[in-house]
């Protein structure tokens, strides 16, 4: 009875529907017996599509519902910002950090930070390009870099592609009802 229709092109309806209910002042509760299965694809191409689509959906929600950012309009504002929107800011913060390091390269502290920054990206590239480097030293930076690249791609798809182009199915098997 609290459900209200959402636009047909909504990319992350599993977030938007409960958020619409919560912003109307209701509590959202989930049945303890309910189950959801979202298996990670072992195929990198499918995982890229899935991540890109989810992050495009976060941008879509941010631009459709800017009022949700304010505590007087959304009692879940901090959860939304910390779990969804800070992830969208990360690539821009990383670009700003690199630019700051390059601008201030004459200072010894910023030279050291630039070396650490560059080393992190080198580890990420090794972890992403060479499957034998799947140990945490390489895979964690690679995963972090991958997520931030998908965030930028998600923004691109949200701004320049139709909703359908960001919503190619990645389902490999139908969900089972228990």
Q: Which residues does each predicted region cover?
A:
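Conserved nucleotide-sugar donor-binding
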Residues: 1-5
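Catalytic donor/gating beta->alpha subdomain of glycosyltransferases that bind UDP-sugars
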Residues: 8-81, 149, 153-157
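Alpha-helical membrane-interface segments at transmembrane helix boundaries
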Residues: 82-86
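Membrane-embedded multi-pass helical conduit in multi-pass membrane proteins
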Residues: 87-163
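Membrane-proximal intrinsically disordered regions of secretory-pathway and membrane-system proteins
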Residues: 166-178
